[in-house]
A protein has these predicted regions:
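Short aromatic-glycine-enriched beta-strand elements
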Residues: 49-60
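Short, basic/aromatic beta-hairpin or loop at an interaction surface
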Residues: 65-78
Length: 132
């Protein structure tokens, strides 16, 4: 009987530990995956860090006001596997890029990157499927 109780407690513990981990690794926890956006602007900074690369860009919003956007992306290892390096992003700083992604649920100028079009016209799709 004691081993059944211990097994039950361990099962509950595993569920309690793994559910938050799953939520952390799910973009839909932070981003509204149904609200795709496209932003064109100037790439200002790239944080080439784990666990996710972050790009910062300035884009003109309503009324011509400059908005400071932040997009989270895949990890550096993913980019290396597809042949994109930190230097590729460094060359693009100060130039115009277009990104497609999904916006944060809280409505801030924060998104999850699904596509990036570099200044030379090269487009990199970070997901499989239809990106609007």
């Amino acid at each position: 009987m004691r081993s059944k109780a211990l097994c039950g407690l361990m099962s509950v513990w595993v569920l309690l530990v793994t559910v938050p981990l799953w939520a952390h690794h799910s973009p839909s926890a932070i981003f509204d995956m149904t609200k795709q956006i496209s932003v064109t602007g100037t790439l200002t900074k790239v944080d080439w860090i784990n666990p996710h690369i972050v790009i910062l860009m300035d884009a003109k919003g309503e009324g011509g006001k400059v908005e400071n956007w932040k997009f989270e992306s895949n990890p550096p290892s993913w980019y290396r596997r597809v042949g994109v390096t930190r230097a590729d992003f460094a060359k693009a700083i100060g130039q115009t890029i277009t990104v497609g992604g999904v916006r944060a649920r809280n409505g801030t100028l924060f998104g999850y990157l699904l596509m990036i079009k570099m200044p030379d016209g090269t487009q990199l799709d970070l997901v499989v499927g239809d990106i609007k």
